[in-house]
């Protein structure tokens, strides 16, 4: 109650100052267009190495604008810190220099936006400063800013009111700048590899391309239920059928599933498809993407995640799923075995399984139980069973497995790729097997997408496809332990 009263008192005081801006200073409290000549960081880059004497003699005039985040002094002299998108810089305001302009900064509260024209200088302590010669009021903040020393204590508030988090937490602000730069670096790499960026439907009549539970909505004009997409895969493959040999899409995906530090119902992925490539080529492509992204934050392509150094500059390891299981458990799934034999092995090792599972499902469960957490450095795990890979091409040497890989780092999956299944007959059989699983209780199994099968019947060249979780990659590169820290507006109750 006391905190609420203090907040109300501060807001009342700011409203009163708002009135004085109009009545006494005859200014628009919410400003208008303002043209600046530099941002804060540009000034630091240009003049940080200049001496006090040099700046005093050269008299460089600049015009800046930003939010006031600190203020010291209240008489004839005021020092204040202003922040813009690039960083912060100190402003030195003197009543004798500014005259009738001086009340603009004297009456300003933390959070207000001002425009400042002035001369670049350095203080005796060596801090780069703008000596104000003219002030412009741009926006009055009617609510007090979060405490700059304690920030926002309530984590929920940080996520619900991200704008406050960005104001109070410079680390968070920079993290989202890095996210943008990482995605830009990925796009630049894809451009260099002759990929074309495309956009595919978010509202779809079939929820396909992944094993996930969709969000369902209703299209009133068409009077049909539709699904928020759970993957971009099937539409991108249609484009390969149509003749676009290298395509990719970065966009939002929606899955109506649980939430935890690594999962949000709405998240960003990148999927790529390249004609005449197979999954080994896609491994090379994936390394290129990760190296391009890592270059944004690290010159040597090494990053530290939760205290562990991850080397993204070296060649990523490549290991078959069955070999990794044998290394960890001694069990050899290369040998042919019945479902009953696989179930007994699972029982012996206390691995849970569903009644409808085949041997391939159990192999995958062994991998998840005994191997995933051991994969710290970047590792391509390939050779997934057919049962858990309905869209991947069978391996030519052992048809129980597919030409598919997942990239694991720190025990988490960062990418999923395969030589795409382009045989429409086999694809239909895989979809039908998925339908059977759904009837036996797997509500994440895929439906039959007749239009996609028809597209394959027109012929899709051998193709390598890749899916990467952008949010998880940003988490890795910014050392964030929860996906909510890299989503500007995460899903909240």
Swiss-Prot record:
Catalytic reaction equation(s): tRNA(Lys) + L-lysine + ATP = L-lysyl-tRNA(Lys) + AMP + diphosphate
Gene3D superfamilies per UniProt: Bira Bifunctional Protein, Domain 2 (3.30.930.10), Nucleic acid-binding proteins (2.40.50.140)
Residues given in the record as Mg(2+) 2 binding sites: 413
UniProt cross-references to PROSITE patterns, sorted A to Z: AA_TRNA_LIGASE_II
A GO CC term assigned to this protein in UniProt: cytosol
Cofactor(s), names only, from the UniProt record: Mg(2+)
GO molecular function, one term: transferase activity
SUPFAM superfamilies from the UniProt entry: Class II aaRS and biotin synthetases, Nucleic acid-binding proteins
Compartments in which it is found: Cytoplasm
UniProt enzyme class: ligase
Manner of cofactor binding, per the entry note: Binds 3 Mg(2+) ions per subunit.
Residues that hold Mg(2+) 1 according to the record: 406, 413
One Gene Ontology biological process: lysyl-tRNA aminoacylation
Keyword check for Transcription regulation: no
Keyword line: Aminoacyl-tRNA synthetase, ATP-binding, Cytoplasm, Ligase, Magnesium, Metal-binding, Nucleotide-binding, Protein biosynthesis
InterPro entries (UniProt xref): Aa-tRNA-synt_II, aa-tRNA-synth_II, aa-tRNA-synth_II/BPL/LPL, Lys-tRNA-ligase_II, Lys-tRNA-ligase_II_N, Lys-tRNA-synth_II_C, NA-bd_OB-fold, NA-bd_OB_tRNA
Stored NCBIfam families: lysS_bact (TIGR00499), PRK00484.1 (NF001756)
Assembly information from the UniProt record: Homodimer.
Family, as annotated: Belongs to the class-II aminoacyl-tRNA synthetase family.
Protein name from the UniProt record: Lysine--tRNA ligase
Organism: Leuconostoc citreum (strain KM20)
